[in-house]
Amino acid sequence: NPAAKKKYSELKVEIKKTGLKNADKIIGQADMAWYQKQGDNVNYAKTAVAYMDKYPSEDPNVLNNMSWTFYEKVTDPKMLAKAVEWSKKSNELHKDHPAFLDTYASLLFKSGNKKEAIAQQEKAISIVKKSPDAYGGESLLKELESRLAEFKK
């Protein structure tokens, strides 16, 4: 929609004019949301990588969510490599979280590292089996096992 794009560009100019210290950060977040909403995965990925390079996150949830979005939407190997880094970091910051391990395993698999993907997914499954109530029980376990079966094909 050209009119919406024009309006969005005008809003970004207005944000910059405010002189806010974090205007560029706000615009970066808005750009990611804009491209995602438009279904423009190529520009979303480029914007997200530039944003994360400029404003690195130490929040494992942010890192995992960005990584999972890349798993679902991005095909460029260089961009996926960035998501693998973010996902690895999320797992370093929050050890033994099955959902974070699943994201990491999924990205490894999509990037062609099948052996390590299987190892990470098996680790996630093991954690859920030890404490099923802490991680959503059977539904998560089935999801993880289903993805592991895909990895092993």
Residue ranges and their predicted role:
Residues N1-K153:
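Oxidative protein folding and maturation machinery
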